From Swiss-Prot:
Name listed for the protein in its UniProt record: Histone H1.C2
InterPro entries to which the protein is assigned, alphabetical: H1/H5
Disulfide bonds: none
UniProt main location, coarse: nucleus
Domain of life: Eukaryota
Keywords: Chromosome, DNA-binding, Nucleus
Region (Disordered): 24-97
BP terms from Gene Ontology: nucleosome assembly
Cellular-component GO terms for this entry: nucleosome; nucleus
One annotated GO molecular function: DNA binding
Biased composition (Basic residues): 31-97
Subcellular location: Nucleus; Chromosome
Length: 97
C-alpha cells in the first residue's frame, strides 16, 4: 500500500515540475488591441402583417346518386346470373274446396 502511495506522489510531483517548465517556456500572450469596427446602421423594422386566417376546411361532398337510367341499364347476362342465384319461390297452390 505504501509503495502505491509513494509511486503516485512521485508521478504527481514530476507532472507538476514538467507543467511549470512548459508554462515558463511559453511567454504569456498580450491582448491584441481591438480594431475600431464601423457601426452598422440599424435596419428599419417593417410593420408586421396581420395574420391571415386560414379558410375553413371544406366539407366532403356527399356521394352523388346514380341517375335512375343507369340503375335500370342492367345487362341480360347479369339478370340471368341473378335469377340463378336467387332462391326459387314455392308456387302456392290454390286451396281445394
Amino acid at each position: 500500500m505504501f509503495c502505491v502511495l509513494k509511486f503516485l506522489s512521485c508521478t504527481l510531483s514530476r507532472i507538476n515540475i514538467v507543467q511549470k517548465l512548459s508554462d515558463a517556456a511559453v511567454p504569456p500572450k498580450k491582448a491584441a488591441p481591438k480594431k475600431a469596427v464601423a457601426k452598422k446602421t440599424p435596419a428599419k423594422k417593417t410593420a408586421k402583417k396581420p395574420a391571415v386566417k386560414k379558410p375553413a376546411a371544406k366539407k366532403r361532398a356527399a356521394p352523388k346518386k346514380k341517375p335512375a337510367a343507369a340503375k335500370k341499364a342492367v345487362t341480360k347476362s347479369a339478370k340471368k346470373h341473378a335469377a340463378k342465384k336467387a332462391p326459387k319461390k314455392a308456387v302456392k297452390k290454390a286451396p281445394k274446396k
